[in-house]
């Protein structure tokens, strides 16, 4: 899974990418994104949720929008609001060429497992195995399926 500290370091050292016109500049989007990740890292999940939500709504075509959506879902997951996390992780798949799809898929399985819906958790883990065979989470999904089938 993505390490939020590594992500902040990478972003701070990267040049801003061009994005479609929005109410904030790509530089401001990136700054707000880093601020939201910092809130997440510091356990200020409500602030992170607010900022990540605004980012996704402000410019869903920004290069960091899929990451914003993923971390929004991650906030809800960390707060143990699994039902909302499922809804937010599912939205990650609506972003073309996202690099967060396998992360989100794994987390969907974790959400259902945490809610006690073992059948659905197995389905979500199996989906990761089927659709993301090259994922770094492939073995983790297989292991989760094995554990839940006992």
What residue ranges belong to the model's regions?
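Short solvent-exposed coil/turn linkers within tandem alpha-helical repeat scaffolds
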Residues: 58-64, 93-100, 129-139
